[in-house]
């Protein structure tokens, strides 16, 4: 209803101003600004909905001010371009309509009415309401009843007798199992669900709506609210360090805790969370690549579900034979939005809906088959009688190609339990949420029936039953939950450990690189993650007087305040204010100590603007002084006009990437010398090794041959035509995820470049 009212007010404002208000620059600007805000808010809502499927929620608050640079980002480029073009067109059309009768005399009453209607349209819009609620949740002091409902369980289970297998199905919500809505989509896993304890009303709450948040909620009984963006958790050294979580209780009770997934464990700090709470044995893409049958069989995120679940079965078999008490947690990935992935071993590779193939539904049908196969192996084993199997979704599906069909249904998370010791077949319609999962499992294993804000759905009362407004209540508890991190409120001294790549201050430790906003009563960490913008772009959003400490590779800050370090990949520390003074310090010791040194200086807005503009220069446009192209730092020498076909800098250099261009092309500002030596330090990838690699300057072509290790080769060129462009053509680019950013599409690698130098020859 609010959507219709909001749009009606918007339309009325446009029509009244366009036809009755007349000519007045001030009223035109004010009305266009407010109407433009309405458009921006609704496009923000649409864009957020596209990424999350749940509007402007806590999970995407961070992306309102930072770039989304991870998780299959290439699949979102076209929608993003469409939004920008659409926004430009709408603003242009809006301005044209409002000025239709600009030659008529100004009418104060109609102008005021149009502006008030425009303000009303903004106030009534769902986007404004959602953002307002999020802003309130950031500034609340907490709720006095939090302590009454947050309960810490006993740290041990008195007499544990059962092993635990806990399967997180990526985005595998219970809605997919509605056979009337989606016939024969999940027959194998659906049949197993119907054989166990099936909890049919597991709702999703704020702070539980993405993978690491769902894991924290289900194991600790609290939403993931943090003093930083949740997916940036990889930068912290400990995770809710004071809380007792399911893994802690299991470890204290004699369990060996294992976790197996196909993606990189570092993503979103899953490794930090699990190590902080009782898990000593972790297996992700890096750990599995040396043990899986086919290390090259991977999708954008890591290993496919069939590979991961095969390894989980091997681990279950090994641990069961040993006779030790254990828990085995695993997380699938093939159903990840926006499209999902199809494992090659499943029979269900294609699912049609509305008369056409649907990739997301196909991925769900395939993944559930793989999960069911894993469970059936356990059920057929002699160890099933000593095992509890839990299957849950980590969160509801985000905006995938099945999302519009899911939204027509009553959506709930998946959570069911199969007990080998005591088979139970029942569907329990009790109202509950993800935070109740850990408490329910703990209850089944013989422990307490509460865990944080979670309650056992077998013997307790969920917060979802106690509070009809549980979503609002959860947001009200947000400050209380953030305080559980015990995060410091001041930063005076700090230490950098180069061996561990860590910074320590006031008892807290963070991985590098890191940006910190420091005020009198708060220290706000801004880590760099797959989902966040680079730190320099985040720093560009700081106010002129905001105090900052920025620890990063020297070359990243050198272009601003330390040009002599433009080619250094060492750690540097910059601190100050963007509108005031800044200092850059080179970290030159293994253990390096310093103090914050913020000066209360006069703010120079011209300096501030210059700093912000420089911080926002994209990597490929950065230029540095050097007599060669150094590939392990961003940018290029000043003599280079532009370049293409080259991937991002890595610690050793850069790969060519045929996804960005079939050729490596470096165009110089001026013609290359008439005679010169081209000194190339590089290596080849895969089948490009020992193959002739054409290198062209103008009409002249030389051949470069590289191995898999870095070597230096000198090629001799004549350049009678004054050509200004160097072209290198890798013969056989290889599609691979090696060294790739998690969630990005595979790169097509050819040669790895360390340095290219042009040396003029005499004569």
UniProtKB/Swiss-Prot annotation:
Gene Ontology terms describing biological process: glucan biosynthetic process
Record keyword Cell membrane present: yes
GO MF annotation: an example: phosphatidylglycerol-membrane-oligosaccharide glycerophosphotransferase activity
Localization (cell): Cell inner membrane
Keywords: Cell inner membrane, Cell membrane, Membrane, Transferase, Transmembrane, Transmembrane helix
Class of the enzyme per the UniProt entry, highest EC level: transferase
Topology within the bilayer: Multi-pass membrane protein
Main localization, broad class: membrane
Pathway noted in the entry: Glycan metabolism; osmoregulated periplasmic glucan (OPG) biosynthesis
TM stretches of this protein: 4-19, 26-48, 76-98, 105-127
PANTHER family (UniProt xref): LIPOTEICHOIC ACID SYNTHASE (PTHR47371), PHOSPHOGLYCEROL TRANSFERASE I (PTHR47371:SF3)
Protein family (similarity comment): Belongs to the OpgB family.
This protein's name: Phosphoglycerol transferase I
Organism of derivation: Escherichia coli O157:H7
Name of the gene: mdoB
């Amino acid at each position: 209803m609010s959507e219709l009212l909001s749009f009606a007010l918007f339309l009325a404002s446009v029509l009244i101003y366009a036809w009755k208000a007349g000519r007045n620059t001030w009223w035109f600007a004010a009305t266009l600004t407010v109407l433009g805000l309405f458009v921006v808010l609704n496009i923000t809502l649409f864009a957020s909905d596209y990424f999350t499927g749940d509007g402007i929620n806590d999970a995407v608050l961070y992306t309102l001010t930072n770039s989304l640079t991870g998780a299959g980002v290439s699949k979102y480029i076209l929608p993003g371009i469409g939004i920008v073009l659409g926004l430009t067109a709408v603003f242009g059309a809006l301005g044209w309509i409002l000025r239709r009768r600009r030659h008529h005399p100004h009418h104060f009453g109609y102008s005021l009415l149009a502006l008030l209607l425009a303000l009303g349209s903004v106030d009534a819009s769902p986007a404004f309401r959602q953002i307002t609620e999020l802003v309130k949740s950031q500034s609340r002091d907490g709720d006095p009843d939090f302590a009454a409902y947050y309960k810490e369980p006993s740290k041990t289970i008195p007499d544990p007798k059962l092993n635990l297998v806990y399967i997180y199905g990526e985005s595998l919500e219970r809605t997919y199992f509605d056979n009337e809505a989606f016939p024969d989509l999940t027959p194998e896993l659906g049949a197993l669900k119907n054989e166990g304890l099936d909890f049919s009303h597991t709702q999703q709450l704020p702070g539980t709506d993405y993978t690491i948040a769902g894991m924290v909620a289900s194991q600790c009984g609290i939403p993931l609210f943090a003093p930083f963006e949740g997916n940036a958790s990889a930068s912290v050294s400990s995770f809710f360090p004071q809380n007792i979580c399911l893994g802690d209780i299991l470890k204290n009770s004699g369990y060996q805790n294992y976790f197996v997934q196909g993606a990189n464990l570092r993503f979103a700090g899953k490794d930090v969370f699990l190590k902080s709470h009782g898990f000593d044995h972790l297996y992700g893409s890096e750990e599995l690549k040396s043990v899986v049958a086919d290390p090259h069989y991977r999708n954008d995120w890591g290993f496919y579900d069939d590979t991961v679940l095969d390894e989980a079965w091997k681990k279950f078999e090994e641990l069961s034979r040993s006779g030790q008490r254990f828990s085995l947690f695993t997380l699938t990935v093939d159903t990840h939005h926006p499209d999902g992935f199809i494992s090659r071993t499943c029979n269900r590779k294609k699912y049609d809906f509305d008369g056409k193939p649907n990739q997301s539904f196909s991925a769900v049908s395939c993944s559930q088959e793989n999960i069911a196969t894993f469970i059936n192996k356990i059920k057929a084993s002699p160890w099933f009688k000593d095992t509890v199997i839990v299957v849950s979704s980590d969160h509801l599906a985000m905006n995938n190609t099945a999302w519009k069909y899911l939204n027509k249904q009553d959506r709930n998370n998946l959570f069911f339990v199969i007990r080998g010791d005591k088979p139970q077949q029942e569907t329990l319609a009790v109202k509950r949420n993800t935070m109740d999962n850990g408490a329910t499992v703990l209850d089944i294993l013989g422990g307490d029936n509460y865990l944080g804000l979670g309650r056992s759905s077998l013997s307790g009362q969920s917060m979802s039953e106690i509070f009809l407004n549980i979503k609002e209540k959860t947001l009200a508890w947000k400050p209380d939950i953030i305080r559980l991190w015990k995060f410091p409120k001041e930063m005076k001294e700090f230490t950098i450990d180069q061996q561990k790549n860590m910074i320590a201050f006031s008892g807290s430790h963070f991985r590098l690189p890191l940006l910190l906003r420091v005020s009198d009563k708060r220290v706000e960490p801004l880590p760099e993650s797959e989902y966040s913008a680079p730190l320099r772009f985040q720093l560009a959003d700081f106010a002129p007087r905001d105090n900052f400490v920025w620890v990063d590779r020297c070359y990243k800050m050198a272009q601003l305040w330390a040009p002599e370090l433009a080619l250094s990949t060492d750690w540097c520390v910059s601190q100050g204010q963007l509108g005031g003074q800044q200092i850059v310090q080179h970290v030159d010791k293994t253990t390096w100590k310093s103090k914050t040194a913020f000066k209360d200086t006069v703010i120079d807005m011209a300096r501030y603007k210059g700093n912000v503009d420089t911080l926002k220069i994209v990597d490929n446009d950065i230029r540095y002084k050097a007599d060669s192209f150094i590939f392990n730092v961003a940018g290029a020498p000043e003599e280079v006009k532009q370049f293409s076909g080259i991937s991002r800098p890595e610690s050793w250099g850069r790969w060519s990437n045929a996804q960005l261009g079939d050729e490596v092309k470096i165009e110089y500002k001026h013609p290359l010398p008439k005679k010169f030596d081209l000194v190339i330090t590089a290596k080849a990838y895969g089948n490009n090794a020992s193959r002739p690699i054409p290198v062209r300057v103008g009409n002249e072509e030389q051949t470069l041959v590289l191995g898999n290790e870095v070597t230096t080769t000198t090629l001799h060129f004549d350049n009678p035509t004054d050509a200004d462009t160097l072209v290198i053509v890798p013969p056989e680019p290889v599609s691979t995820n090696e060294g790739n950013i998690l969630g990005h599409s595979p790169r097509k690698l050819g040669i790895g470049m360390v340095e290219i130098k042009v040396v003029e020859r005499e004569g």
